Structures are given as structure tokens and as C-alpha cells.
Amino acid sequence: MRKPIIAGNWKMNKVSKEALDLVNQIKDEVHKTEVEVVVCCPFTVLSQVQKALVGTNLKLGAQNMHWEEDGAYTGEISANMLKDIGVEYVILGHSERRQYFNETDETVNKKVKKAIKENLKPIVCIGESLEEREANQTFDVIKKQLLGAFEGVPAEAMDNVVLAYEPIWAIGTGKTASSEEAQTVIAYIRSLIEEKYGVDISEEVRIQYGGSVKASNATEIMNETDIDGALVGGASLKAEEFLGIINF
């Protein structure tokens, strides 16, 4: 039985006071121990949020990291830096990173390997654009991204990996893949994992859906067989809405 995982991706939002206000509104309301809940904050508030999460059911996540240990990489953050302040999860390969910061399957692969090596749990994002979907290329794109991200990653490393299917056309647009559409693609992702790593691992790896998830559609999405959670964007910035998703 795969434990559902709901991760809130705050993106570039919330200064210190706002971050703590939001965490304080939700931390005592997360009682469902059968659901794992992660808040993925901007780097600037991670340390403060970590302190606020002590003794709660919430886990701490970051939104990105570099694949090198340290060095002359101005503006970057390493896995060790994240571990040092208590980060457990890290989002890698988000479509906005690919779109605006030229991330590729190759750089995502380097980050995945480094995260695993440093015992961080990567939430690895894959998904197609509207143009690719309309050209019936969804499965081709998904396969390329998934195999690229996990090139050279051994089977035993998959225990702590989470995948997130985030169709780019549904991110921040208000459009949402129907639960059936999401299930179809996520079932395909699971079949790719089975091909690469075998049936046991494919049945254990958790796969989230991300793309305009909100309280009103969370239950329908989460009821699908292969969907094990949600990577939540805008709705995670509002306590009531995020709690509505967590308590689907």
C-alpha cells in the first residue's frame, strides 16, 4: 500500500512572516498520519519554517538544488546546504525550471543522482506541453523525460524517489487534466518504471499529479488507482484550500 504524499510548492512566494503565518495555520490541523504532507518553501524561509515544523506531521522540502558539492556556482544551493537545515525532500525538474532556466533531462539526472547520494528524497517532475499533447506526443515526451532523469540510477535508489506528473498546460492556468486523463498518463509512467526496474519497484514508487489541484477536485484525483498524491502550487498558499486537499 503506497502512502499518499501531498506536497505544497510555494514557488517564489512568502517572506518570513507570511511563511510562518501560513505554517502556523496548517501545522496543527494535519492529523492524518496516513498521508504524508510536505511544504516546499523558498530557500530564504526554509530554516525558519523547519523550526516551526518540529513536533508536527509536516515535512520540509526545497524547490531546487545544484548537483555539485560546493564551489564557484554563484546563486546556487547544494544538497548539503539543504540537509544542514533539516530539508528532507527536494523538487527537481519542475517545468518552470525547464522553461525559464534551461534545465534539461541531463541536468535533472545529475540532480537526481546527487540528491539520492546525499539521502535527500527527490520529487522528480515530468510532463508535456500543450503543443506536445495536441500532437499526440505525450507518451513520447514522458518516456524521454523519465528515462533521461533516471539514467544510471540503480533500482535500490528508487525507495525514496517520488515522481510527479505535471502537464505543463495545466500549471497555473486553471485548466486541469481530468482524473481519467491523469490516471492514463500516470499508469503509463508506472509501466515505464516496471520496464526499467521491475514490477515490485513499480508498485512501490509513489506518483503524484500536479496541475491546478484544488480542494474541489482533490478527492476525484486521489481516487484514481495509480495516483498517490498531489504536487500543489497556488492552492498551497492558502491554508484552508491546502487543508482541503490534504483532507481529501
Curated annotation (Swiss-Prot):
Pfam families (UniProt xref): TIM
Residues binding substrate, per UniProt: 9-11, 172, 212, 233-234
Protein name, entry field: Triosephosphate isomerase
Record pathway: Carbohydrate biosynthesis; gluconeogenesis; Carbohydrate degradation; glycolysis; D-glyceraldehyde 3-phosphate from glycerone phosphate: step 1/1
Subunit structure: Homodimer.
Locations listed in the record: Cytoplasm
Functional note: Involved in the gluconeogenesis. Catalyzes stereospecifically the conversion of dihydroxyacetone phosphate (DHAP) to D-glyceraldehyde-3-phosphate (G3P).
Family as reported in the entry's similarity comment: Belongs to the triosephosphate isomerase family.
EC number, as in UniProt: 5.3.1.1
Predominant location category: cytoplasm
Catalytic activity: D-glyceraldehyde 3-phosphate = dihydroxyacetone phosphate
Entry keyword set: Cytoplasm, Gluconeogenesis, Glycolysis, Isomerase
Entry-linked InterPro entries: Aldolase_TIM, TIM_sf, TrioseP_Isoase_bac/euk, Triosephosphate_isomerase, Triosephosphate_isomerase_AS
Keyword check for Lipoprotein: no
GO annotation terms (biological process): gluconeogenesis; glyceraldehyde-3-phosphate biosynthetic process; glycerol catabolic process; glycolytic process
The organism of origin for this protein: Alkaliphilus oremlandii (strain OhILAs)
Enzyme class: isomerase
Active-site residues from the entry: 94, 166
UniProt GO cellular component terms: cytosol
GO molecular function: triose-phosphate isomerase activity
